[in-house]
Amino acid sequence: MATTTPSRSTRSSMQSPARGTSTPLSPTRISRLQEKEELRHLNDRLAVYIDRVRALELENDRLMVKISEKEEVTTREVSGIKNLYESELADARKVLDETARERARLQIELGKFRSDLDELNKNYKKKDADLSTAQGRIKDLEALFHRSEAELGTALGEKRSLEAEVADLRAQLSKTEDAHRVAKKQLEKETLMRVDFENRMQSLQEEMDFRKNIYEEESRETRKRHERRIVEVDRGHHYDYESKLAQALDELRKQHDEQVKMYKEELEQTYQAKLDNIKRSSDHNDKAANTALEELTERRMRIETLGYQLSGLQKQANAAEERIRELEELLSSDRDKYRKLLDSKEREMAEMRDQMQQQLNEYQELLDVKLALDLEINAYRKLLEGEEERLKLSPSPESRVTVSRATSSSSSATRTSRSKRRRVEEEYEEGGASTGFGAGHSLGSSRITASEGSSRTITSGQSSTTRFHLSQQASATGSISIEEIDLEGKYVHLKNNSDKDQSLGNWRLKRKIGEEEEIVYKFTPKYVLKAGQSVKIYSADAGVAHSPPSILVWKNQSSWGTGSNIRTYLVNTEEEEVAVRTVTKSVLRNVEEEEDEDADFGEEDLFHQQGDPRTTSRGCSVM
């Protein structure tokens, strides 16, 4: 560490090399030149650090904008896909319930057809036995016909007894058929109710499992957007298969109903004709025998026809069952395919998470570097303050001049160095940008005061040092706050601090600078500031591209303006001020100094030999 203290000296001892080029450099001059080079080197390092921090902050803003845009896109896509998936799943569940109900009904009808077939077989066997018995009796009657007329009376009596038995049997058969029909209907109703309750229970269970899986696996919902296309394609095939199957089953059902009805009518007619023939056979034995033989032949042919038809119906029923099994296998294969697609989408989501984590790690490393730079700059400033304290010197604007590179060849360079120092202090003490001025937000009001600065003007006879003070005051009555304003008039930064979107349609952002005319920026009618997001409104000369909703450009205004008293406020559609930020620049003092003291700030830039007894109150320390 080197300590230098400027002092007042005579003109003969402070002459520049240009006045005495033949005089060799003294050790004091060499030491001062070395200290000057060392300070320039340190100033270069500080400038590099500041540029690096600004670049990191710009990169940080860019990354935050990218992350917010990605989060908005992801949220929008996930919500849309979730709604589509829920609707598609509800439709699929409804179709499955209808299919299960239709299958149960078809199974009931198939069981009914099988029971009708068994009943027809039993009736056929019974009628065949009755036919054999009738043939035996016909032979007996033919034998008895030749015996005597007395036996004819006996036969007539037997005939009457048989007719009574047939009537009793018919009545019993009718009652039994009615009871059987009622029982079958009740069984069908109970079966349908049981199947319906089972389907409803299964649907509720599936819905409960689905809601549980939805909340546990929200990350998988993004894969549904690929599934939507597949479902739309397969849905058409599925609907075609269902419509064709339903049409075929309806046709089979109608054919079965018509055939069964026809069979019943024909059997009843045949049975009635047989009874009539038996009655007439007692009166006309010869005619009855021939009629019985013809009826037997017709019945045999009819039974064979019915057998063929029943076998055809059984084949159709088997084909329908085979088709149902094929459709179930197709549905199972589709489910397996969709499951594989879901697994692949899960892997893609895992890769995306890894990439996001890697980006976050890189971002954290950048933040660590920025923090290290901030600490180094703060240490630099504390060393300067400690050296001033050690030498019992009050902090003066001249002590800050050494932070930035400057020469005494012109007064403009000195003013530039002090201006740079002021901006550095505003950036690292206030947390704002290099040219911006702002701080945190609150619903009340907050006051933030920047570091003092100074400017120096050198004339032929004297110099003046002007110190100024920057302060700002911000307040907000709602969720929108004015987060930052640029002192050079390039932009104004607004932020939505709530968790809800805020419509800024037709709101106006106004700026008043001293006594100048007020300028007004009006938002578009449909502009909305998202929750937690921010927007910067740049002037036309800022050189920034228009990129809504985070970056807006005021094309009709070249600059927001600069001045010593800047008031920026946001007004809603009801002319109420919802956010205000005021920046004030005030002059603290103006000190006049003599010409010979200005000479000390000449070519050697406040450097002198250490330990000079002519040390004044000015001094600085350099790391």
UniProtKB/Swiss-Prot annotation:
Principal localisation: nucleus
**Record's protein name:** Lamin-B2.L
Q: Quote the biased-composition stretches of kind Low complexity, using this chain's numbering.
A: 1-18, 398-416
Q: Which UniProt keywords apply?
A: Coiled coil, Intermediate filament, Lipoprotein, Methylation, Nucleus, Phosphoprotein, Prenylation
- Residue ranges of region Tail? 380-592
Q: Where is this region: Linker 2?
A: 212-235
- Lipid moiety-binding region (S-farnesyl cysteine): 620
State its role. Answer: Lamins are intermediate filament proteins that assemble into a filamentous meshwork, and which constitute the major components of the nuclear lamina, a fibrous layer on the nucleoplasmic side of the inner nuclear membrane. Lamins provide a framework for the nuclear envelope, bridging the nuclear envelope and chromatin, thereby playing an important role in nuclear assembly, chromatin organization, nuclear membrane and telomere dynamics.
The UniProt annotation puts the region (Head) at 2-27
- Which species does the entry assign this protein to? Xenopus laevis (African clawed frog)
